[in-house]
């Protein structure tokens, strides 16, 4: 609440209007979804999709994308954009960080041509790609020219799955996986500080993960992730913070 109040005081954001906040977590169908629409000007709005939160339900849903073309949050993302397009007839931009960018791209690709004709840029910040089958659809092909993709130099999440969208490499002041936080990305004169190449570590991780998912069937991937997360749930872990805290305690006790 304090941050919201401070944003309201800033000249840059005082004229913005917020609409349609939606947030849902459903463990029964493995879904974590959140979105918000912001009016930038009378004729332009931006639909912003939230990335994965701290819940393991959200993280499990992320890894479902390695074997399933469509996850529960994709359906919500598509319906949310459809609804916003019905109540607003101007230009609609889309954006999201991490899974949020993935949802933005999927939602845009899944729209009817009339809605797609009103879409502006789609900003994906260190966001996973999509299942390879989605890349073959007419809807995806139609929105690829609109998409802009940004990843840090030691990217991991932003290289997962498949994408045909060129990326801009942003310099981060953090280490390894901590670069996933956009708060660590460097800005100079109002622009991202960019780099020419990904780190060798990022390239190796990307090659290793893609090789593994290509060699394993979708059925085997589904079984692996189901067993992996069920293990975490069984020992009482509910959030990613639990994994880095309690889980390491269990490992130390075991050994």
Predicted regions and their residues:
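Short glycine-enriched nucleophile-adjacent loop
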Residues: 104-113
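Gly/Ala-rich beta-loop-alpha elbow adjacent to hydrolase catalytic centers
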Residues: 95-100, 104
């Amino acid at each position: 609440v304090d941050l919201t109040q401070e944003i309201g005081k800033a000249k840059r954001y005082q004229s913005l209007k917020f609409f349609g906040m939606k947030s849902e977590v459903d463990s029964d169908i493995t879904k974590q979804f959140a979105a918000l629409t912001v009016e930038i000007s009378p004729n332009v709005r931006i639909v912003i999709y939230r990335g994965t939160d701290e819940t393991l339900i959200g993280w499990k849903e992320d890894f479902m994308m390695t074997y399933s073309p469509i996850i529960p949050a994709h359906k919500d993302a598509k319906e949310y954009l459809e609804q916003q397009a019905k109540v607003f007839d101007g230009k609609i931009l889309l954006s999201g960080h991490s899974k949020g960018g993935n949802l933005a791209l999927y939602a845009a690709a899944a729209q009817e041509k009339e809605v797609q004709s009103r879409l502006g840029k789609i900003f994906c910040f260190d966001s996973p790609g999509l299942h390879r089958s989605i890349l073959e659809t007419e809807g995806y092909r139609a929105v690829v020219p609109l998409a802009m993709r940004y990843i840090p130099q030691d990217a991991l999440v932003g290289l997962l799955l498949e994408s045909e969208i060129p990326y801009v490499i942003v310099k981060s002041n953090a280490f390894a996986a901590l670069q996933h936080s956009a708060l660590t990305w460097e800005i100079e004169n109002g622009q991202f500080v960019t780099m020419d190449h990904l780190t060798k570590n990022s390239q190796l991780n990307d090659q290793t993960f893609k090789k593994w998912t290509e060699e394993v069937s979708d059925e085997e991937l589904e079984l692996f992730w189901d067993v992996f997360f069920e293990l975490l749930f069984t020992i009482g872990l509910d959030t990613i913070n639990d994994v880095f805290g309690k889980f390491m305690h269990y490992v130390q006790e075991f050994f």
